[in-house]
């Protein structure tokens, strides 16, 4: 066998090995679009955008299908019962997520991207934030923020100008999160040019055709390489801007030594002291940790400052976009369907009347 045959055989083997990941869904009989070598279905996804891509894929391949981002397999599930099983009943099984953030000390430490026992531990610390008793304590604060929104609506009603409701609800949501979770008054409803609002706008309206952002999206390993050299896209820059805001909030809370029953206080109470002085025995214990001795871990292993900031940023982002977008669509439906608007109002007033936490809670019984 000559050198040409050896090289040809080696090259062919390399190509087959590179193509092997694209056989994953075929091997387990999950339908889906044919992937392109190296890119998978990523270019189709970017061209059509996520909503259109998902809709077309569901219509063509059914409620469960597989596609690839580069050589990484992804399963798209549109079956409500299956989604319920995965996200609620079996959620503890699906803890680890797709790793997409560079090592910037913020995004890579989000709860949603932590893995295994690190995820379980951090999630356990955050659970009290969403308890009924905590939500009840924040009702008065929430009412004040809603009052500001009502005053704004009155001003809108008295003017003949068009109103950008997405911006209105964006400011409202920021005010609600900042006051209930962090004990600070942003009042962006009165000041829509607040720096935090600008950070959110920059983050959520990322241009995915920006060269650096496109590369980071297409090739998940690239952000980690770029991040080590300090190269950032608008996405990463806006993330760092909100992280700086979060650090300032944390510093102010520590400086004033104020204790509140809120999300931020839970994180600060879990602060890991002397993080640089963990001995080798404890490091070994953390590395070999099992779920059974996790309660002992909590008493030893708190959260680092980076982890605290990351969860604050995640809380701000996760709560902001989902809530403000839902309210924007809801307001559009009500204003274009006045008969439905009146029906909703009448039923709320008939069943609940003036809103209070006990009345809301009673509706679930």
Model-derived segments and spans:
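Cytochrome P450 C-terminal heme-thiolate binding region
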Residues: 70-84, 91, 241-255, 266-267, ...
């Amino acid at each position: 066998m000559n050198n040409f045959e050896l090289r040809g055989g080696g090259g062919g083997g390399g190509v087959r090995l590179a193509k092997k990941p694209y056989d994953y869904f075929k091997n387990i009989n999950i339908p889906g679009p044919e992937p392109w070598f190296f890119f998978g279905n990523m270019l189709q996804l970017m061209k059509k955008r996520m909503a259109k891509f998902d809709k077309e894929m569901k219509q063509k391949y059914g409620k469960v299908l597989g596609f690839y981002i580069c050589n990484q397999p992804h399963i798209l599930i549109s079956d409500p019962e299956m989604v319920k099983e995965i996200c609620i009943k079996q959620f503890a099984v699906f803890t680890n997520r797709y790793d997409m953030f560079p090592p910037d000390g913020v995004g890579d430490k989000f709860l949603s991207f932590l893995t295994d026992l690190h995820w379980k531990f951090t999630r356990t610390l955050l659970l009290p934030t969403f308890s009924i008793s905590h939500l009840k304590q924040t009702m008065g604060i929430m009412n004040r923020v809603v009052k500001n929104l009502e005053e704004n609506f009155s001003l809108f009603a008295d003017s003949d100008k068009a109103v950008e409701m997405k911006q209105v609800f964006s400011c409202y949501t920021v005010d609600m999160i900042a006051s209930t979770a962090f004990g600070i008054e942003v009042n962006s409803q009165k000041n829509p040019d607040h720096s935090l609002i600008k950070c959110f706008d920059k983050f959520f309206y990322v241009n995915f055709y920006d060269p650096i952002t496109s590369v980071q999206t297409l090739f998940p390993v690239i952000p980690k390489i770029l991040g080590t050299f300090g190269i950032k896209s608008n996405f990463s820059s806006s993330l760092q801007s909100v992280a700086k805001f979060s650090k300032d909030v944390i510093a102010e809370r520590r400086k004033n030594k104020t204790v509140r029953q809120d999300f931020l206080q839970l994180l600060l109470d879990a602060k890991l002291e002397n993080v640089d002085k963990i001995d080798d025995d404890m490091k070994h214990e953390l590395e070999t940790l099992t779920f059974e001795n996790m309660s002992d871990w909590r008493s030893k292993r708190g959260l680092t400052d980076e982890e605290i900031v990351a969860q604050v940023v995640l809380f701000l982002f996760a709560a902001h976009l989902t809530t403000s977008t839902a309210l924007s669509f809801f307001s559009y439906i009500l204003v274009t369907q006045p008969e439905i608007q009146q029906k909703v109002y009448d039923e709320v007033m008939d069943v609940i009347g003036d809103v209070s936490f006990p009345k809301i809670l009673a509706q679930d019984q």
